[in-house]
């Protein structure tokens, strides 16, 4: 009788069924739907108003149409469905203000996996791809204070906390950095 595959084999096979590719304008409705699926469970327990603000500001069709030409964006597809995405690029190309930063930074702005597809290695694959496509010797990212799962995920993959940006109204942003290249 054939042996049943282990959980590790199943996970590896499920991850192998996932393809990564650059996002296009045709993906915008799927990106919005991904945001609706992943943003509320991620940030709602931290601050429900903040979760809604994120969706309204950063996950709209207009915002994606504006950022796609300026930011590098990857999607992960499984069975023809967009199940995850990541965006990254230079801090100076962003529309946001970062008064605490001098100089420029390579930043991964987003890494989001649909909750039905967590734990299959998709986030790790996207992160590795972003690291390999990043020009420069370090990669930065922000984690919202209280997003412990994401924080632990990044620390286990070589990121270290550098600074915290406080905001009276909203949760703090914690900036993490990972050396790339030889120290990867
Ligand atoms: C953090 C996140 C990107 C990780 O993606 P993923 O595809 O689930 O990650 P992987 O399968 O590659 O790796 C899973 C790792 O994350 C941990 N993990 C986090 N959430 C998990 C879940 N729901 N199920 C299983 N593992 C989970 C595991 O401990 C595992 O770590 P290990 O491999 O060191 O044991 C994903 O959980 C996510 O999209 N979270 C919500 C959005 C978010 O917080 N994004 C980051 C914004 S800064």
Regions found by a protein language model. Give the residues of each.
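A broad helix-preferring feature
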Residues: 18, 83-89, 140, 159
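A short helix/loop element that forms part of the nucleotide-sugar donor recognition site in Leloir-type
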Residues: 6
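C-terminal "cap" of GNAT-fold acetyltransferases
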Residues: 3, 100-106, 137-152, 156-184
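Acetyl-CoA-dependent GNAT
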Residues: 3, 11-13, 22-28, 32-118, ...
């Amino acid at each position: 009788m054939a042996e049943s595959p282990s959980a590790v084999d199943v996970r590896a096979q499920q991850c192998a069924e996932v393809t990564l590719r650059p996002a296009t304008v045709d993906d915008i409705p799927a990106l919005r739907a991904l945001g609706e699926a992943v943003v509320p469970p991620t940030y709602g327990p931290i601050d429900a108003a903040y979760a809604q603000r994120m969706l309204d500001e950063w996950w709209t069709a207009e915002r994606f149409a504006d950022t796609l030409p300026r930011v590098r964006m990857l999607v992960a597809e499984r069975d023809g469905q967009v199940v995850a995405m990541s965006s990254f690029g230079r801090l100076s190309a962003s529309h946001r203000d970062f008064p605490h930063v001098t100089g420029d930074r390579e930043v991964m702005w987003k890494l989001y996996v649909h909750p039905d597809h967590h734990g299959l290695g998709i986030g790790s694959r996207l992160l590795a791809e972003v690291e390999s496509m990043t020009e420069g010797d370090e990669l930065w990212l922000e984690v919202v204070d209280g997003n412990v799962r994401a924080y632990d995920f990044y620390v286990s993959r070589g990121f270290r906390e550098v600074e915290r940006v406080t905001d009276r109204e909203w949760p703090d942003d914690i900036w993490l950095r990972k050396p790339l290249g030889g120290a990867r």
